[in-house]
């Protein structure tokens, strides 16, 4: 082999390696952040997000704090921005606590979306939303009403925290619906488990002991609902109606034993998948406007809605809400069809 030919081959090899390196660097990277890791609900959402990444050929990283805190999420957001991620999708533990970090990310060209739990709308582009507050708050009350069946009743609300965006919006709507449609229902207490399984169980048992004549616990939280069911079993209380939101895999034994007659949710795997599809569309095509539609493999078509569907006054170009197609009521008859 001549020296000239050797140099030519070496040069081509270097160029080839450089091209491969550029392609790797150019690949889209999307971060999908839950409120915390180790909870089945968020793990299922992460599975959907990573499934979408494989379908679209983009790199999706699922990671979150071990405890639900603003500081933990901010640290992750900053790390992902510094690592050059193109998009961040976060389930926010606070409506405003993440805003400085998210606004800095947007200023650096990172696409910012929320899923499950929103920030203030000016702190993100799109919110992948499981349902409007009126839809989900109404769903909670209707599930309880199907079991309470009396004009005068005592009801407790039990969920994650007094600051989390989504659950407080649902509960506000649920309480308004109770006042309007069930004026004889007394809301005796509203308590919180702070996304901790042990504390949630202790709190649920405390509610049932303090209000022995309680008719219903409404628990729109993936930790609070199974904790309420377990507390009822521990205390041998089979008279209280327990409704709320959690995943079918977590709630299956309580439904099969009859402790919980029905509960609700949405397909959180789909929610994770839709989130990544929307982020990918933004990275490839730019912003979307109200009324724009997007086809999601295995899900169907979703549409961009204005922020007003969530009760917000804020509207801007490249900003809105993508609602999931449907919500689900789980019971003994259909829970076997679901695995997440």
Curated annotation (Swiss-Prot):
One of its GO terms (biological process) is transmembrane transport. The lineage of its organism: Bacteria, Pseudomonadati, Pseudomonadota, Gammaproteobacteria, Enterobacterales. Residues 1-26 form the signal peptide. Part of the ABC transporter complex LsrABCD involved in autoinducer 2 (AI-2) import. Binds AI-2 and delivers it to the LsrC and LsrD permeases. Keywords: Periplasm, Signal. Belongs to the bacterial solute-binding protein 2 family. This is Autoinducer 2-binding protein LsrB. GO terms for molecular function: carbohydrate binding. The complex is composed of two ATP-binding proteins (LsrA), two transmembrane proteins (LsrC and LsrD) and a solute-binding protein (LsrB). The gene is lsrB. InterPro entries: Bact_Solute-Bind_Prot2 (IPR050555), LsrB (IPR030159), Peripla_BP_I (IPR028082), SBP_2_dom (IPR025997). SUPFAM superfamilies: Periplasmic binding protein-like I. Coiled coil: none annotated.
């Amino acid at each position: 082999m001549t020296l000239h030919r050797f140099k030519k081959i070496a040069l081509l090899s270097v160029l080839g390696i450089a091209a491969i390196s550029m392609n790797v660097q150019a690949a889209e990277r999307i971060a999908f952040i839950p409120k915390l890791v180790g909870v089945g609900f968020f793990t299922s959402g992460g599975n959907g997000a990573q499934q979408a990444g494989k379908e679209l050929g983009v790199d999706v990283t699922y990671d979150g704090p071990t405890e639900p805190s603003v500081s933990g999420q901010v640290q992750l957001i900053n790390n992902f921005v510094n690592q050059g991620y193109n998009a961040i999708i976060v389930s926010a533990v606070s409506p405003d606590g993440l805003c400085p970090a998210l606004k800095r990310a947007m200023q650096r060209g990172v696409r910012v979306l929320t899923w499950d739990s929103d920030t203030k709308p000016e702190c993100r582009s799109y919110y992948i939303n499981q349902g409007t507050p009126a839809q989900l708050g109404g769903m909670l009350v209707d599930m309880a009403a199907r079991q309470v069946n009396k004009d005068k009743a005592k009801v407790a609300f039990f969920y994650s925290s007094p600051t989390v965006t989504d659950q407080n919006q649902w509960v506000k709507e649920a309480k308004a619906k109770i006042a309007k449609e069930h004026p004889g229902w007394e809301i005796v207490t509203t308590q919180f488990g702070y996304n901790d399984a042990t504390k949630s169980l202790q709190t649920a048992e405390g509610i049932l002991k303090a209000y022995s004549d309680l008719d219903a616990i409404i628990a729109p939280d993936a930790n609070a609902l199974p904790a309420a069911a377990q507390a009822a079993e521990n205390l041998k209380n089979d008279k209280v109606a327990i409704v709320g939101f959690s995943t079918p895999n977590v709630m299956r034994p309580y439904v099969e034993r009859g402790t919980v007659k029905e509960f609700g949710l949405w397909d959180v795997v789909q929610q994770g998948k839709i989130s990544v599809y929307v982020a990918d569309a933004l990275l490839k095509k730019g912003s979307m406007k109200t009324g724009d539609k997007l086809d999601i493999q295995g899900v169907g078509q979703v549409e961009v809605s204005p922020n007003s569907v969530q009760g917000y006054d804020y509207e801007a170009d490249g900003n809105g809400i993508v609602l999931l197609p449907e919500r689900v009521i789980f019971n003994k008859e259909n829970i076997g069809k679901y695995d997440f």
